[in-house]
């Protein structure tokens, strides 16, 4: 009799995705981040569900409902900080996952890559709206500043912003709709993840060498199930260390002050994982130009597959490209630092140079470097 996992319509899908999936024999820890993102999404949906049971999306009670969760609900503080810091872990894994894709040329799987970009935008939108919900000072002013950017769109801008706000400022209507969207989006993300995996399993995983590995495949279970579980344990350990020892390390103290439309905080800034994009936005003096640069800083990922000039897929055997890649990483860290600094000298010019270098590296230097490497190899 054939095993039920190979015949049952539902179990067959699970079997082909997690058990009998042929996987390259040489994929490194950089390939763990996909499953870690799945774990992060599950943690966020579960903790978010329990938070939603006690949260009220009303301007009068939102802040105090979060306080109530932390003070009065059984382990409410734990659920709240797991959710807040879980978002940080989510973005760490996301950026590592995208970085891995760029380094090893995984972007040549176009459908998988493009759905990944849509997923990135969806997760960023969800995180932004989630940050508004506690209705602290930074929640309110962050929402005001970021939604206001849409007013830079010619002709329809102002109307669009007022439509999103549900009034003439960020108020009760805005908070209610942000809560609704923040609740529904993770489930849309989960559906997109399924499509992401569907397209990935059409081609199979890439591997560090970038060479087709059809001749050397191993079953996903037990080799990569055990490897993923090790990753899960490390992620949970790091998350628990963060939550139990310094839960507010990555947060903003201003968000412990209830939202006040009459009092602007001295430095309005988003959560740390958006600072690089915020720095790019601020580096251009023109409003529309800044918004375009902000969108392009993420959307540029869609252009990367078409700028792949190398005869090799991966950067594993391309030392000059490797140097440029790590300069790009350093540049993004610089932008993250600048995004958290006030708008004054020397931070303005550093931010402008780092923003210029970011686009220059991706659009010009890396493709040109690939061509030079081809010449060096006489290809």
From Swiss-Prot:
Heme b b566 binds at residues 97, 196. One of its GO terms (biological process) is mitochondrial electron transport, ubiquinol to cytochrome c. It is a multi-pass membrane protein. The keyword Membrane applies. It is found in: Mitochondrion inner membrane. This is Cytochrome b. Gene3D superfamilies: Cytochrome Bc1 Complex, Chain C. InterPro entries: Cyt_b/b6_C (IPR005798), Cyt_b/b6_C_sf (IPR036150), Cyt_b/b6_N (IPR005797), Cytb/b6-like_sf (IPR027387), Cytochrome_b (IPR030689), Cytochrome_b_C_euk/bac (IPR048260), Cytochrome_b_N_euk/bac (IPR048259), Di-haem_cyt_TM (IPR016174). A ubiquinone binds at residue 201. The cytochrome bc1 complex contains 11 subunits: 3 respiratory subunits (MT-CYB, CYC1 and UQCRFS1), 2 core proteins (UQCRC1 and UQCRC2) and 6 low-molecular weight proteins (UQCRH/QCR6, UQCRB/QCR7, UQCRQ/QCR8, UQCR10/QCR9, UQCR11/QCR10 and a cleavage product of UQCRFS1). This cytochrome bc1 complex then forms a dimer. Keywords: Electron transport, Heme, Iron, Membrane, Metal-binding, Mitochondrion, Mitochondrion inner membrane, Respiratory chain, Transmembrane, Transmembrane helix, Transport, Ubiquinone. Component of the ubiquinol-cytochrome c reductase complex (complex III or cytochrome b-c1 complex) that is part of the mitochondrial respiratory chain. The b-c1 complex mediates electron transfer from ubiquinol to cytochrome c. Contributes to the generation of a proton gradient across the mitochondrial membrane that is then used for ATP synthesis. One of its GO terms (molecular function) is ubiquinol-cytochrome-c reductase activity. It holds the Pfam family Cytochrom_B_C. Belongs to the cytochrome b family. It comes from Lepus saxatilis (Scrub hare). Its cofactor is heme b. One of its GO terms (cellular component) is mitochondrial inner membrane. Heme b b562 binds at residues 83, 182. The lineage of its organism: Eukaryota, Metazoa, Chordata, Craniata, Vertebrata. The chain crosses the membrane at residues 33-53, 77-98, 113-133, 178-198, 226-246, 288-308, 320-340, 347-367. Binds 2 heme b groups non-covalently. Heme 1 (or BL or b562) is low-potential and absorbs at about 562 nm, and heme 2 (or BH or b566) is high-potential and absorbs at about 566 nm.
């Amino acid at each position: 009799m054939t095993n039920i996992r190979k015949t049952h319509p539902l179990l067959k899908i699970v079997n082909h995705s997690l058990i009998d999936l042929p996987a390259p024999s040489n994929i490194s820890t950089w390939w763990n981040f996909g499953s870690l993102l799945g774990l992060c999404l599950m943690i966020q949906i579960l903790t978010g569900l329990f938070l939603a049971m006690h949260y009220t999306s009303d301007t009068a009670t939102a802040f105090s409902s979060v306080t109530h969760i932390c003070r009065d609900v059984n382990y409410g503080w734990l659920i709240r900080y797991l959710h807040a810091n879980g978002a940080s872990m989510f973005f760490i894994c996301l950026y590592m996952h995208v970085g891995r894709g760029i380094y090893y040329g995984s972007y040549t799987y176009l459908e998988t890559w493009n759905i990944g970009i849509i997923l990135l935008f969806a997760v960023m939108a969800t995180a932004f709206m989630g940050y508004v919900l506690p209705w602290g000072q930074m929640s309110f002013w962050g929402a005001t500043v970021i939604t206001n950017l849409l007013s830079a769109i010619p002709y329809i801008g102002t109307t669009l912003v007022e439509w999103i706000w549900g009034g003439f400022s960020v108020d009760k209507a805005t908070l209610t709709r942000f809560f609704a969207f923040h609740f529904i989006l993770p489930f849309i993300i989960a559906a997109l993840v399924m499509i992401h995996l569907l397209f990935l399993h059409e081609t199979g995983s890439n591997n560090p060498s970038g060479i087709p590995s059809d001749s050397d495949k191993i079953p996903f279970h037990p080799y990569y199930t055990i490897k993923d579980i090790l990753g899960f344990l490390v992620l949970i350990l790091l998350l628990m260390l963060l939550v139990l020892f310094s839960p507010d390390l990555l947060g903003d103290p201003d968000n412990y002050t209830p939202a006040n439309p009459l009092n602007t905080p001295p430095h309005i800034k988003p959560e740390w994982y958006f600072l690089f994009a915020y720095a790019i936005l601020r580096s251009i003096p023109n409003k529309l130009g800044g918004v375009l640069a902000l969108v392009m800083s993420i959307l540029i990922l869609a252009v990367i597959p078409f700028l792949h000039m190398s005869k090799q897929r991966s950067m594993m055997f391309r030392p000059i490209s490797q140097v440029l890649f790590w300069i790009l990483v350093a540049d993004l860290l610089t932008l993250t630092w600048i995004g958290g600094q006030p708008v004054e000298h020397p931070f303005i010019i550093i931010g402008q140079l780092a923003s210029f270098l970011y686009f220059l590296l991706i659009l010009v230097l890396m493709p040109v470097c690939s061509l030079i490497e081809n010449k060096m190899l006489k290809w």
